[in-house]
């Protein structure tokens, strides 16, 4: 067409090398092995690339040649939005991203529903290794990760997988400390709101049989820590009501608290296995006209910013450092044959949502 301008194709590695009068290896080294070139020569190559529109080496071709993808995969058995909505997941993701960024690696999220059994996303992921974020022991996606010939690091759960590095906290010990705080205040009539315990969707009271089939070690260990602490003061675990929520949200905690307290109005304390659930329980208590902590003590676990603002008594854990440690462990593994297990510290943070029950003196006197 008359008067139309021609669209110039971007330069290629070969055309850029010809333009500069250097070898194609020299151009490639400017991107992939900069230490092989003098600083002036590398800058000359990069300046010409910018001027001629050369985008750099094709990452697909490079990965085929080097057999490295330059990316870490994060297996998340939740919807993708969960990673940006849940504050614990967000903090972990930030820490992992910082580790990848420092190492010049990309980060690929591999989100799959906990009720989804198709593992093809795991096999399609072009990554050099996986960080597995808190999945159940028999999760098919985790089993698919283990079949891939790449290093793997687990965050939180499952624990004790042969040959696999792990980063986590001692959930049982942490919850034992919280339980002792409550029993020290005089609480004996305690109820629990917990996160998902198994793959099968369930919302409501947790039976004794379901407690023996818990597939998520973190929840199993947090409940065990509470059981240990209550046993120290003679509380029969069989009499402790536990309410489960499959979905993890403030709304889930709110509805669980409504059901739990309707069934057991005698409770003086509600222990939630996450801050998110505890914030929901706080909302319900307020709507019900209960004073927290005078009428009802409520506690959480995680130490998320919103819980801190609410003055929640909780167990704080270093979620950002978890992510950073998991990333560094994966990226620094090298030829190390023995797995490393890193246990990070937790801290009991007593806020404004726990105090002695009004009838504490009666319990202490044994009446």
For the regions a language model picked out, list residue spans one by one.
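Alpha-helical recognition/docking segments in bacterial nutrient-uptake
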Residues: 1-11, 26, 71-184, 367
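N-terminal helix-turn-helix DNA-binding module of bacterial transcription factors
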Residues: 1-68, 366-367
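Flexible loop/turn connectors
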Residues: 13, 254, 258-367
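Short beta-strand scaffold positions
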Residues: 17, 132, 272-273
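Non-catalytic positions within long, well-ordered alpha-helices that form the structural scaffold/packing
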Residues: 18, 65, 123, 183-186
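Short acidic/polar active-site loop segments enriched in Thr and Asp
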Residues: 23, 70, 128, 187-189, ...
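Short acidic capping loops at alpha-helix termini that bridge into adjacent secondary structure
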Residues: 188-189, 237-240, 291-297
